[in-house]
Every structure is written in C-alpha cells, then in structure tokens.
Amino acid sequence: MLHRKIYHLALAAMMALPASVGFAEEAPKVVRIAAVVYNIAGKTTYLNGAAVLTEGGLEETLAKKGVKIEWVPASHSAVGPIINEGFASGKIDFASYGDLPPVILNASRPTVQLVAPWGRSGNSYLVVPAKSKASTIEDLKGKKIALHRGRPWEIAFANLIESKGLSFKDFKIVNVNPQVGAAALASGTVDGFFGLNDAHILEQRKVGRIIWSTKNSPPDWKLMGGLWASNDFIKKYPELTQTIVTAYVKTNYWTSQDANKDKYIKEYATNALPEEVVRKDYDNDIVAWKDRWSPLYDDALKTHYRRVASYAKQSGLVRNEVKLDQLLNPQFVEHALKELNLEHYWQSQQIKQAQLSPAAGKGK
C-alpha cells in the first residue's frame, strides 16, 4: 500500500513538471552552430563566434557538460538560404543570422524560434557610383539597383522607398548577392547598390558614395536578428538551450559596456572588416551603444517581427502567414537575465511601427 502511494505521488510530481523539464533527453555530444564565416589572411573566423566563446564562456561551459561545439560555415554571399537549408535538413541546431530568412523558413512549417535577440545593431546603406549625381532614392527612379531579395536589409529598402511614395516597380531591381552587387556598382553596371556596412569599403576605395543609411532612421528599420534554435532541439534539450542562450546574453552584456567597446571592435568586429569601416558603421548612430545589444523581447522587437512577417506575405516572398508566437521564444532570455542579475540593465523600447503598404514589396 505504501509503495503504491509513493508511486502515485511520484507520478503526480512528474506530471506537474513542465514538459520541457520532465522529458528532456540526455545532452548530445556535439552542438552544431551555424554562423557567417569570413576568411581573413587565410584564417577562418565566425561572426560573433570568438566573442561568445571568450567573453560568454560558451566553449568552457559546454565542455563541463561533455558537449563540443561544431561551427557550421555560412558564406556571407548566401547566409539566409544556407542556414535555412541547414535547419530544414536537420544539419544544424542553432544559427546566428538576420530576421527575414527565418521568417521565410517558418512560413513552410514552424521550424525555428528566436531564443536570443542580438539587439538593434545592423545598419543598411544605399550606395551610388562615386561620380553619380544622385543624392536621394528619388534620383534613382527607373534605374538599376542591386539588391539581394529575401535578405534582412530588404525590409529597410522597402521602408525607404515606401516612405517616399515609391514601390519596387519604380526601379529595375537586380537580384544579386552583396559581393556581386558591390562589383556591379564599382564597374558601373548598376546605378545603385543596397547592402550592409561593407558600403564603407566602396567609399574607402573611392568607387562608391553613401547617400542614405538607417543610422538616423527609425530604430526598427535596423536589422533585428539573433540566435535562432531548431524547435526539435529546444524540445529535446531545454537545459542545454538555456546554457547556450545564457552565454550569448552574457556576451551581449559584456559588449554593451562602453569600457569594452574598443576591445570588441579591435579583437572581434575587425575579424570580418577593417577597423576603420567598423567604426564608421557604429559612429553617429541614433541607437546608443548599450541599446544596440539589448536582448529584450520588448514592444519594439515584437512590432518589428510583426512587420517583417506581414511584409514577407504582402511582398510575395511567402504564401502562408507566420504567427509571432511561433517565431519568438523569450523564456530563455528571461531566465538568463535573472541568473546574471541583469533584469533591469536594459530598458524596454517602444518604437512606432513603420507602415508598409503591400505595393512596396511587389514587382519582383
């Protein structure tokens, strides 16, 4: 009788536990994390990889659990498609990338969730040839603009043209990756190029001139990507997911401190781009350095992703609607902030949503 009572009590206790805790599987031996890869002077480096290993202590923490990290390279020329394919085929568990590609991936079926936002840190730029007389987006109406469709900065481009009463149909969009787009601008094949901070390299080489950027635009026009995790991995290994997210939040905290800004730029950011280019990207920005690295799931982030999901469908990039609660999973960041005593370090931001008309993204 006593044994039966103990059995029922134990069973009741197990059923009372959250599913993610009660049925977590034994940790895998390897965690596969995809990230943008750069080859600088024959040395392979991963975007944010070195920082999270050193300042976040990820490798050391996982080693104590008997888990190794396998970095999976994603070429800068096609980050979104490569990572989306990796998630879809089950070849990766985590990935650090931008906001539009994972929305496109989840439109087929819920596959990934954002478990650790990297903040509001990505600027987009409109560049014209150095000798071009164009000074505004309106000056490029009817002309060729190199833009890689389906990449995160497409949202910023759509915001820009829609704010001027224009649409994709007002331009001849050349859908090529950033490297090809930059080369096309340098050779005079296109009249404009829309991309990320490598726009400063075009200026540095005196082949391009930046005429617009998101630096002084509404903060929600910036890229808001982060660390995404496979739904299957989250379900099987919630504790390990928490360990990884905590390391990323710890890295964000370290990076966000003004005292560490120079070290971050010199030792980590410059693994991909020259220091001068990195500093130009960060200087004179409407978003403060600390806030650039906020991992909060605040109204600003939710509004941004609601807009991204809406734009993806309106523009014809996806057929199915993507629900916000299938994209965002704040529980791991919330736990990490408590564990690291950072609950009040970052402040939530409310950002007025940029209204995108369906016409802005049409005309592929």
Spans of model-derived segments:
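Extracytoplasmic "Venus flytrap"
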Residues: 30-54, 78, 150
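Ligand-binding cleft/hinge of the Venus flytrap
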Residues: 49-68, 154-172, 205
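A ligand-binding cleft/hinge motif common to bilobed small-molecule-binding domains
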Residues: 96-108, 158-159, 190-210, 304, ...
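Segments of small-molecule ligand-sensing domains
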Residues: 26-31, 279-364
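Flexible hinge/capping segments at coil-to-helix
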Residues: 129-144, 235-239
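Pocket-lining segment of extracytoplasmic ligand-binding domains
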Residues: 174, 179-275
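Secondary-structure end/capping motifs
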Residues: 38-43, 237-322
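Short helix-initiation/N-cap motifs at beta->coil->alpha
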Residues: 70-85, 98, 166, 171-186
